[in-house]
Amino acid sequence: MFYLLYLLNDDSIVFNIFRYLTFRSFGAGVTAFLISIVLGGVFIRFLTRRQFRENIRDDGPETHKTKAGTPTMGGAFIVIAITFSALLWTNITSEVVWAVILFTLSYALIGFLDDWLKFTRKKGMRAREKFALQIFFALLFVLVLMADIDGFRMALSADKVADYPFTSVVLPFFKKAVINLGWLYLPFAVLAVVGASNGVNLTDGLDGLAIGAIVVAAGTYIVFAYLAGNAEFSKYLQIPYIPEAGELAVFLAAVGGACLGFLWYNSHPAQVFMGDVGSLALGAAIGAVALIVKQEILLIVVGGIFVAEAMSVILQVASFKLTRKRIFRMAPLHHHFELSGWSESKVVIRFWVICLVLALFALSTLKLR
C-alpha cells in the first residue's frame, strides 16, 4: 500500500523513502509486532471466555498437565498481523506477493478448521482429509508459480550469465550446480511446502519452541530474498536473480514481527498456544518463500529442527509397527529430551541455539562454494 504512494508520487522526497526495501521491511516488522501485541491480549480474553482451551494428551510428560486450560488458536492473530502488515508495506501489485499471502491464508484456513472441529466435535479433521487439503493448495500454489515465473537468471562467472527455467533446483555448496527437474519439480515443491508446514506443526509442543524457530527461519530467508531480488548482489554471489523476490523480504519481516509479538504471550509459562491455524500457516509461508527464491534445498538446513521433529515421529511410528519397539522415549523429539530429564526451558533454549547455528551455516553457503 505504502509502495503505491511512491509510485504515484515518485518525485516527492517524503514518499521516496517507501521505495527502499530495507525501510519497508523494518516498517512491516514493527507494524506486525505491534498488531500482534495489541490483538494478543484481546484474543486471549476472547478465547478464554469462549472456552477455546488446549486439551493435553494423557500420555504426555507430567509437567504438561499444568498447561491444561491454556487458550489455543492464538495463531489467528499472528495471521491477521502478517496479512495486514504485508498488505500495508509490500508492493501489492506483485503477483508473487499475492500468491504467497493467499497460500499462507489457505493453510491458516485448514488449521482453523482443524482447531474448530476439535472444540465442536472433540476431534479434529481426519489426518487424511487435512493432508489432502494441504496437497491440493500446495499443487495449486506451485502451478501458479510455474505459470507466473518464467525462470531465473544466475551468474556463472564475472562475465557470463545463464537463464534457467523455474523448475530448476540450485544445489548449495557447488558452483554452477543447477538441475532442471521439469515436471518432477511439481511433486518436489509440493513435498517441500507440505513438509515445512507439518514440520512446524509437530514442533509446536513446548512454550516458545516453534515460534522462536520460525523467527530464525524467517530472518534467514529475509537475507536470501533480499539478495535474490537485487541484480548486483545476486550476480556477485552467483545466486538466482528473481526480480520480485525482494518484496518477499518485506513479507517475511511481517512474519518475524508477528511471531515476536506472539512470543510475548507464548513464552514460558505460555498464556496462549498458536494451534494448527498458526503452525500450518507459518510453515507454509516459509516453504513458499524458499521455493520462490530458489533455496528449496537449504530449507532442510534452515528448518533443521522441523525436519528432526518430523523424522522423529516417522521413525517412532515405523519402528513400533515393524519391531513393536520405540526408538525415542516419546515423539516428537522435544518430548524425548523432556523425559530424559531436561527442563522445558532448557529444551527450548537449546533447540533455539541449534536453529541459530543452522541458520548461520545456511547463510555461509552464499560464499562457500
Residue ranges and their predicted role:
Residues 111-113:
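Conserved ATP-binding subdomain of kinase catalytic cores across diverse folds
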Residues 38-59:
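Membrane-interface helix-loop junction between the first two transmembrane segments
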Residues 2-44, 80-109, 135-136, 141, ...:
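Alpha-helical transmembrane segments
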Residues 57-70, 122-130, 134, 334, ...:
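Juxtamembrane helix-capping/reentrant segments at transmembrane boundaries
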Residues 118-127, 173-178:
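Membrane interface segments of multi-pass transport proteins and intramembrane proteases
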Residues 74, 115, 276:
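Divalent metal-coordination and catalytic microenvironments
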Residues 55-72, 95-96, 222, 232-236:
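Alpha-helical transmembrane segments and immediately membrane-proximal extracytoplasmic
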Residues 47, 116-124, 270-271:
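Membrane-interfacial helix termini and the short, flexible loops that connect transmembrane helices
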